[in-house]
């Protein structure tokens, strides 16, 4: 069993974290079942957020009565101290607990610090002093904010996208966190569904002893894959390296990671899927994307307002309207039978 310690927090768990964003899409009963199954199999770290609709509520029911046996991380996207306290109290109620193991600022556009005028970090400190939270973390998709958080010495963990199609810049963050004794939580280990070989994804993350990957789980078969890696962790074999090299070649350049931070779109476009449809058609079962419902979603691209809000919000600096246009043209060719997927 691979184990990881999250820096100075002392939180030590097996190298399989449960990402609870997807369980907002399934029933309470199914979500509770998955979370409890994960716990029984040995997963101890569960990551959610106030922004993930009813995800916290579902975890709260799942761990009622066994709270001290799991580590729960959640997040606030508050922009001021007043909203911070509202989020924290709501999360505590939803999770049926009086403390949160790791409380994280959720993808802020800046790095909260004492005296910056927002009151956010001071609120974190007060919550920790009161025992409402035990450790302070930050999540982000922006390299500059991530570096500032590490350099500040104010945070115990950083959560950032990291997968085998990441570049040298992300690897630099991993090494920098290790040098600062700061835990690194890897989100997007499957790159929003573009990586389809979970064994290769796990083997890559396992190379870095200070990294805890959290896997977004919505279906039991997905959970079962990662549970199998607890006792039989995949290693970097020649076969797995070949898979990684192939994907790195295919997924190089500009592509949408599906993070959703450009949403909502004023034209109603489901950008986080539509802007990467060409890849989804070729790397996942295409029937759902080509269904009448899928076609209706893609057709909304025709109503793009060219307001460039999505482009301005993209943490990866992508030209999102141009990506949407290219993906829509390819989609229409696939529908017309001009291109096979």
What are these regions (language model features)?
Residues 3, 35, 56, 60, ...:
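Generic structural signal for well-ordered alpha-helices
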Residues 44-49, 73-74, 134-137, 157-160, ...:
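Short catalytic-loop micro-motif centered on adjacent basic/acidic residues
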Residues 43-44, 172-186, 190-341:
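Structured C-terminal cap/extension of enzyme domains
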Residues 37, 41, 94-95, 152-153, ...:
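Structural motif
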């Amino acid at each position: 069993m691979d184990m990881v310690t999250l820096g100075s927090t002392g939180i030590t768990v097996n190298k399989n974290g449960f990402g609870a964003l997807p369980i907002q899409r399934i029933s309470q009963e199914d979500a509770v079942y998955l979370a409890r199954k994960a716990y029984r199999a040995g997963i101890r770290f569960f990551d959610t957020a106030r922004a993930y609709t009813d995800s916290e509520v579902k975890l709260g029911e799942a761990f009622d009565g066994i709270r001290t046996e799991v580590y729960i991380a959640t997040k606030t996207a508050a922009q001021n101290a007043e909203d911070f306290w509202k989020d924290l109290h709501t999360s505590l109620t939803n999770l049926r607990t009086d403390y949160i193991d790791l409380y994280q600022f959720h993808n802020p556009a800046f790095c909260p610090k004492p005296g910056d005028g927002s009151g956010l970090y001071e609120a974190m400190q007060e919550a920790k002093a009161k025992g409402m939270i035990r450790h302070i973390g930050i999540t982000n998709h922006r390299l500059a904010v991530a570096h500032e958080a590490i350099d500040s010495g104010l945070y115990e963990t950083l959560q950032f996208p990291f997968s085998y199609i990441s570049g040298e810049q992300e690897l630099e963050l991993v090494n920098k966190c290790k040098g600062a004794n700061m835990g690194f939580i890897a989100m997007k280990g499957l790159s929003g569904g573009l990586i389809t070989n979970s064994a290769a994804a796990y083997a890559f993350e396992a190379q870095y002893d200070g990294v805890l990957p959290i896997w977004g789980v919505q279906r039991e078969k997905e959970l079962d894959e990662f549970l199998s890696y607890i006792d039989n962790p995949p290693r970097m074999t020649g076969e797995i390296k070949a898979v990684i090299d192939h994907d790195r070649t295919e997924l190089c350049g500009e592509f949408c990671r599906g993070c959703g931070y450009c949403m909502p779109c004023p034209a109603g476009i489901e950008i986080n899927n539509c802007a990467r449809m060409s890849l989804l058609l070729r790397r996942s079962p295409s029937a759902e994307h080509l269904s009448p419902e899928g076609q209706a979603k893609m057709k909304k691209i025709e109503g793009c307002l060219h307001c460039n809000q999505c482009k301005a919000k993209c943490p990866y600096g992508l030209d999102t309207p141009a990506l949407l246009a290219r993906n829509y043209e390819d989609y229409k060719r696939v529908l017309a039978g001009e291109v096979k997927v």
